[in-house]
């Protein structure tokens, strides 16, 4: 066997060149058991809580339970291809999602992957899904209105930018319809309003049917509202970890706008299903159950999510994130565990009732039980001026209506109150997909509280309102513009508005 010097020197050179090169160390663990979307992993000693880990075949998971001898991992995807003895790799990254304007108009899953078939997302940066909420110093009190376009809400239960207003009610009471109308109502501002007033929308669908989400997206698309909206969908067929994560992912996407001096609205539809998904994960991870078998930290789950909605101060760019969480009750039971939790976290609630819905009062808002704890600071002055009296009148009407059932001979004052109340209730009805601008609402409610409806039969109120709006949009356009610009009803403007309504009332028959 002949030894060539050149070959030996080549081998030596190669070994010298690679001397001291570190091998890439990736920390791995082994699957001990897997089932129900949960894997128990041995190893991964230095894994962080909430860190992404990778299973064979590219399936991802998140380390949630860090125990003495193993790690409990929830799996984002099907667990049927994972088996005992499989290798699990750390990624070193806490769960994050893409953020930025590139997401507008898209439908994504809880990890920010597109699911609408429109190609990859053009996002520039990624942010962690679970970050700390802003403290007390960065915040500012809520003072700008977030218009929903619904008279019953904007007049009586006003929502401000940076507020958290709960939408609560039984199934099929129109909770999603309120969210949808609020999103559609932002179209006019996006089309011709100033940049600083635009409101970007994020809609998080948790545990809903795919057909429902597809229908929701279709309506947004047809009405031109998808271009300023992001849809995060974790449907009923998605694993529980995805349903648990979706609200946090959506919140991170909304925070991008808040932190860059813009305004965003996020709705979680609905948080009851997120709590159920979290309960499922917690029980499978063998965490101790509490009331209604929910884990002890289910309050913290929702509070840390909803506290991220905030109005930031001037130094941080004046941005805001408004949250409209949805909770579904069973048989109008607001005193169950999750509803009471979320009511205590939010700044008010819009309470929807089945009876009202079937009576044809839609949106089915129970004005007596609904509150906004931010209140009139989230209204323009003009709306305060006209809506101040309507709340009192409706409260008196409800009280009197209860008594009126017992007695037939009512004095004239009571009769007047009942007449006015029934007409105001009629006035607050509104069909779906017809949100009104604030100045139009002011004109309509002004007519209601100043007695223009008192002589009309109740079934003519809707017709009168429709006619009045058409008249104001044509002949009274300058009055509406003045209300929008001045944001208050001066004596002069009040007289002009009165004159326009008088002119219309004469022609109405």
From Swiss-Prot:
GO CC annotation: plasma membrane; proton-transporting ATP synthase complex
Compartments, record wording: Cell inner membrane
Enzyme Commission identifier(s): 7.1.2.2
CDD domains attached to this UniProt entry: ATP-synt_F1_alpha_C (cd18113), ATP-synt_F1_alpha_N (cd18116), F1-ATPase_alpha_CD (cd01132)
Binding site for ATP: 169-176
Keywords: ATP synthesis, ATP-binding, Cell inner membrane, Cell membrane, CF(1), Hydrogen ion transport, Ion transport, Membrane, Nucleotide-binding, Translocase, Transport
Superkingdom of origin: Bacteria
Site, as annotated: Required for activity: 370
Primary enzyme class: translocase
Gene3D superfamilies named among the record's database cross-references: 2.40.30.20, ATP synthase alpha/beta chain, C-terminal domain, P-loop containing nucleotide triphosphate hydrolases
InterPro entries for this protein: ATP_synth_asu-like_sf (IPR023366), ATP_synth_asu_C (IPR000793), ATP_synth_asu_C_sf (IPR038376), ATP_synth_F1_a_nt-bd_dom (IPR033732), ATP_synth_F1_asu (IPR005294), ATPase_a/bsu_AS (IPR020003), ATPase_F1/V1/A1_a/bsu_N (IPR004100), ATPase_F1/V1/A1_a/bsu_N_sf (IPR036121)
Entry GO MF terms: ADP binding; ATP binding; proton-transporting ATP synthase activity, rotational mechanism
Reactions listed under catalytic activity: ATP + H2O + 4 H(+)(in) = ADP + phosphate + 5 H(+)(out)
PROSITE patterns tied to this protein: ATPASE_ALPHA_BETA (PS00152)
Membrane association type: Peripheral membrane protein
Main function: Produces ATP from ADP in the presence of a proton gradient across the membrane. The alpha chain is a regulatory subunit.
Subunit: F-type ATPases have 2 components, CF(1) - the catalytic core - and CF(0) - the membrane proton channel. CF(1) has five subunits: alpha(3), beta(3), gamma(1), delta(1), epsilon(1). CF(0) has three main subunits: a(1), b(2) and c(9-12). The alpha and beta chains form an alternating ring which encloses part of the gamma chain. CF(1) is attached to CF(0) by a central stalk formed by the gamma and epsilon chains, while a peripheral stalk is formed by the delta and b chains.
Annotated family: Belongs to the ATPase alpha/beta chains family.
HAMAP family in the cross-refs: ATP_synth_alpha_bact
PANTHER family: ATP SYNTHASE SUBUNIT ALPHA, MITOCHONDRIAL (PTHR48082:SF2)
Protein name per UniProt: ATP synthase subunit alpha
Gene name, Swiss-Prot/TrEMBL: atpA
């Amino acid at each position: 066997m002949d030894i060539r010097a050149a070959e030996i020197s080549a081998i030596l050179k190669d070994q010298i060149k690679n001397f001291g090169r570190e091998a890439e160390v990736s920390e791995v663990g082994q699957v001990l058991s897997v089932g129900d979307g949960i894997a128990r992993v041995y190893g991964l000693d230095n894994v962080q809580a909430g860190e992404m880990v990778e299973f064979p075949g590219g399936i991802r998971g998140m380390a949630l339970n860090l125990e003495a001898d193993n790690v409990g991992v929830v799996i984002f995807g099907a667990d049927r291809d994972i088996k005992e003895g499989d290798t699990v790799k750390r990624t070193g990254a806490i769960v994050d999602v893409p953020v930025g304007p590139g997401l507008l108009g898209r439908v994504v899953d809880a990890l920010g992957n597109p699911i609408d078939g429109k190609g990859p997302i053009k996002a520039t940066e990624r942010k962690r899904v679970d970050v700390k909420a802003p403290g007390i110093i960065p915040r500012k009190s809520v003072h700008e209105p977030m218009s929903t376009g619904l008279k019953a809400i904007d007049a009586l239960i006003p929502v401000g930018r940076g507020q958290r207003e709960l939408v609560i009610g039984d199934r099929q009471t129109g909770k999603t319809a309120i969210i949808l109308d609020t999103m559609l109502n932002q179209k006019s501002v996006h089309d011709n309003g100033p940049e600083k007033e635009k409101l970007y929308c994020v809609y998080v669908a948790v545990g809903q049917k795919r057909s429902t989400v597809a229908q929701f997206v279709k309506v947004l698309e047809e009405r031109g509202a998808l271009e300023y909206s992001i849809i995060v969908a974790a449907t009923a067929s998605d694993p529980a970890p995805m349903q648990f994560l979706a609200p946090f992912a959506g919140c991170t996407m909304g925070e991008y706008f808040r932190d860059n001096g813009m305004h965003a609205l996020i709705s979680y539809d609905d948080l009851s299903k997120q709590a159920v998904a979290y309960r499922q994960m917690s029980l499978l991870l063998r965490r101790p159950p509490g009331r209604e078998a929910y884990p002890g930290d289910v309050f913290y789950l929702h509070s840390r999510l909803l506290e991220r909605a905030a109005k930031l101060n001037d130094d941080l760019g004046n941005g805001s994130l408004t949250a409209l969480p949805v909770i579904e009750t069973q048989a109008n039971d607001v005193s169950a565990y999750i509803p009471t939790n979320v009511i205590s976290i939010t700044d008010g609630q819009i309470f929807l009732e089945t009876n009202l819905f079937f009576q044809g009062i839609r949106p089915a808002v129970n004005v007596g039980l609904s509150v906004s704890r931010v209140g009139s600071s989230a209204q323009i002055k003009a709306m305060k001026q006209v809506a101040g009296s309507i709340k009192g009148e409706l409260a008196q009407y409800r009280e009197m209506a209860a008594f009126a059932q017992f007695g037939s001979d009512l004095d004239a004052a009571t009769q007047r109150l009942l007449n006015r109340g029934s007409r105001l209730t009629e006035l607050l009805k509104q069909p779906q997909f017809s949100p009104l601008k604030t100045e139009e609402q002011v004109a309509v409610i002004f007519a209601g509280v100043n007695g223009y409806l008192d002589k009309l039969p109740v079934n003519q109120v809707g017709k009168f309102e429709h006619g009045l709006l058409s008249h104001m949009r044509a002949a009274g356009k300058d009055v509406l513009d003045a209300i929008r610009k001045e944001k208050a009803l001066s004596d002069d403007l009040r007289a002009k508005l009165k004159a326009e309504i008088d002119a219309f009332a004469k022609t109405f028959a």
